[in-house]
Swiss-Prot record:
NCBIfam families: PRK00011.1
Keywords from the UniProt entry: Amino-acid biosynthesis, Cytoplasm, One-carbon metabolism, Pyridoxal phosphate, Transferase
Name recorded for this polypeptide: Serine hydroxymethyltransferase
KW Ribonucleoprotein (keyword) present: no
Location within or outside the cell: Cytoplasm
Length: 436
């Protein structure tokens, strides 16, 4: 007798056999439309990337069915022997990539990784220091409306107004004055190499923990294009999907066994419940890619492409904050063109170039308006763009912003011209040809 005869009704069979296009055409169309957008747009958002087919497969696997509270070998549920393999692969690959002794791959996001560190090391009301959002920090580094700003006492440090770089002497002065329990370095819109050794010296002077949030540059570290903060920090957190180019999520790294135990407990059961095992599998797949020699080549290209894009824009009259970039990202000040960040980002999006509005340090504009845009080269580098293409991208951005400056009420003609050029350019660097 066929096993299919045992279904109580045909709906059970279709539940396991029918594709999304059959069961939910509306959702399938939204996903298909997003695929087309990614294929035909130049992605310059500094926090996004394009993952491999392998990462997509791992994250879309049957591991989504498995609950696995706890850690490998110490689960609260049975049947975890195979997901244990996936998580152990993620952990061991992280340790190898970043040359660290302990790793936690369970945080659902970078924000939750940061929250778990706060839970492990701080008590409500404790003082900590982080780069202010206005200078390129992150909302989890002390923004008043965030958990870190509500539960703790954040002290923000800013970049120097003249050099537009971190003022380490001022950081030390603030640390000596406020005696923080934790000092955070790293941010979401700071494009220069950070002196981790100096930060550790400052932390040691006041008896503080040093935490590095390397969400934006962990991929650069993995590809040997940026100093490794694990050599100096008590704890390092990161996302896994930006330049790192793995499945979307967070990680926590440390070289201290006593702290590792605290972080594990803070993640589970302190801050999260069951880990997302399909996501951890996707992370593991991406981590293996980061261990391969061609990942270093990718990082070299990301950095070289950022330099050429930055220089092209500077030569065309834009101001690049801090004068350039040491990373994948750059903060572009639009005030020389009398254009606001929100208007530029919208017009560029209409032209199939995707970026985000971003405040510049000490910006007088509101957060939803801004005086700048933030650009990153990692996603377009992943699809194969090189120096020639990024020089072209710089010219296309210039064309759109200049058009907007000259005709702020209607930049449609320029947007259409650039959009056609972008579609032609991206067609030479196809992605996900077998997806529908």
């Amino acid at each position: 007798m066929s096993s299919e005869k045992n279904y109580l009704n045909e709906n059970y069979k279709s539940f396991f056999d029918d594709s999304l296009s059959v069961t939910d055409p509306e959702l399938h169309k939204a996903i298909s439309d997003e695929l087309k957008r990614q294929q035909q747009h130049i992605e310059l958002i500094a926090s996004e990337n394009i993952v491999s087919q392998a990462v997509l497969e791992a994250q879309g696997s049957v591991l989504t069915n498995k609950y696995a509270e706890g850690y490998p070998g110490k689960r609260y549920y049975n049947g975890c022997e195979h997901v244990d393999v996936a998580e152990n692969l993620a952990i061991e690959r992280l340790k190898k990539i970043f040359d660290c002794k302990f790793a936690n791959a369970q945080p659902h996001s970078g924000a939750q990784a940061n929250g778990a560190v706060f839970l492990a090391l701080l008590n409500p009301g404790d003082t900590f220091m982080g780069m202010s959002l206005n200078s390129g920090g992150h909302i989890t580094h002390g923004l008043k409306i965030s958990m870190s700003g509500k539960w703790f006492n954040p002290i923000g440090y800013d970049v120097d107004k003249e050099s537009e770089l971190i003022d380490y002497d001022n950081v030390e002065k603030l640390a000596l004055e406020h005696k923080p329990k934790l000092i955070i370095c790293g941010g979401s819109a700071y494009s220069r190499v950070i002196d981790f050794k100096r930060f550790r010296e400052i932390a040691d002077k006041v008896g503080a923990y040093l935490m590095v949030d390397m969400a934006h540059f962990s991929g650069l570290v993995a590809g040997k294009g940026y100093p490794n903060p694990c050599e100096h920090a008590h704890v390092v957190t990161s996302t896994t999907h930006k330049v790192f180019r793995s499945a979307r999520g967070g990680i926590i790294l440390t070289n201290h066994e006593d702290l590792a135990k605290k972080f594990n407990t803070a993640v589970f059961p302190g801050y999260q419940g069951g880990p997302l095992m399909h996501v951890i599998a996707g992370k593991a797949a991406g981590f293996l890619e980061a261990l391969r020699p061609d990942f270093k080549d990718y990082i070299k290209s990301v950095l070289a492409n950022a330099k050429i894009l930055s220089e092209t824009l500077k030569n065309n009259g834009f101001k690049i904050y801090s004068g350039g970039t040491d990373t994948h990202l750059m903060l572009v000040d639009l005030r020389p063109f009398n254009v606001k960040g929100n208007a530029a980002a919208e017009s560029l999006s209409n032209a199939n170039i995707t970026c985000n509005k971003n405040g510049i340090p000490f910006d007088s504009e509101k957060p939803m308006i801004t005086s700048g845009i933030r650009l990153g080269t990692q996603a377009a580098t992943t699809r194969g763009f090189g120096l020639k293409e990024f020089e072209k991208v710089g010219e296309l951005i210039t064309k759109v912003v200049k058009g907007l400056s000259e005709n702020p009420e209607d930049n449609g003609k320029i947007e259409e011209e650039v959009r056609n050029e972008v579609i032609d350019l991206t067609s030479n660097f196809p992605i996900y040809k077998n997806l529908k």
